[in-house]
């Protein structure tokens, strides 16, 4: 069901713009809410995946989860974006190139790392390194927990081998997803496979992050129960 729903998103803007944007927000929010539920259920030690349902509170069940998901990436990429802003003001980077780099994120760094400012690439990689912990904090404790960098860094140090393993699995899944998608014949088939793999690996990643907390929460600098 999730796979089919996610296939709809790229075609939504082809209709009325305002209506299309609203539908995109609802579908993306629903998907983000499901991913957060997967992480939270794994963190609680539950074996089964949560159901992809929501109540009729659109703001709390759809809009806010999407805001949290986007916000998690904004938080980790703030240093890189500040660097781009300063580079643009200094005339070292074209504003349009800066926008492309900012929206490209970690994928663009790996694809065109040599064509981007080294400082920007380093800051993006540092942000991606912290993302699993940031999304975990937001999912379990809200945005107010991401400001405690001392606790975040302390927790990563205490669980460093497992945290690095989680990161390697995250990037490995991304590489595998891209490889399998590229091997498919035909643009339409690649699109369908890409969406399916994205959904699958997103679920796996959220489970991994949740289980990371469940099994090693005694080493965390704080606790959510």
Write out the residue ranges for each language-model feature.
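Selective transmembrane-helix segments that form parts of the transport pathway or gating/packing helices
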Residues: 66-78
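Hydrophobic alpha-helical transmembrane segments of multi-pass membrane transport/permease proteins
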Residues: 1-14, 169-173
């Amino acid at each position: 069901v999730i796979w089919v729903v996610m296939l709809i998103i790229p075609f939504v803007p082809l209709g009325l713009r305002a209506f299309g944007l609203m539908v995109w927000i609802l579908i993306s929010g629903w998907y983000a809410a499901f991913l957060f539920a997967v992480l939270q259920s794994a963190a609680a030690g539950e074996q089964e995946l949560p159901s992809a349902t929501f109540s009729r509170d659109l703001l709390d069940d759809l809009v806010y989860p999407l805001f949290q998901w986007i916000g998690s990436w904004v938080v980790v990429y703030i240093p890189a974006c500040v660097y781009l802003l300063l580079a643009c003001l200094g005339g070292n980077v074209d504003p349009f190139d800066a926008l492309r780099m900012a929206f490209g994120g970690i994928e663009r760094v790996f694809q065109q790392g040599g064509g981007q400012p080294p400082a920007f690439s380093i800051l993006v990689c540092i942000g991606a390194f912290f993302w699993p912990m940031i999304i975990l904090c937001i999912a379990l404790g809200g945005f107010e927990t991401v400001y405690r960098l001392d606790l975040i860094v302390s927790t990563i140090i205490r669980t460093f081998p497992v945290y690095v393993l989680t990161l390697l699995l995250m990037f490995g899944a991304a590489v595998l997803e891209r490889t399998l998608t590229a091997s498919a014949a035909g643009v339409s088939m690649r699109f369908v496979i890409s969406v399916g793999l994205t959904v699958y690996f997103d679920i796996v990643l959220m489970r991994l992050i949740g289980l990371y907390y469940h099994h090693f929460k005694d080493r965390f600098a704080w606790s959510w129960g």
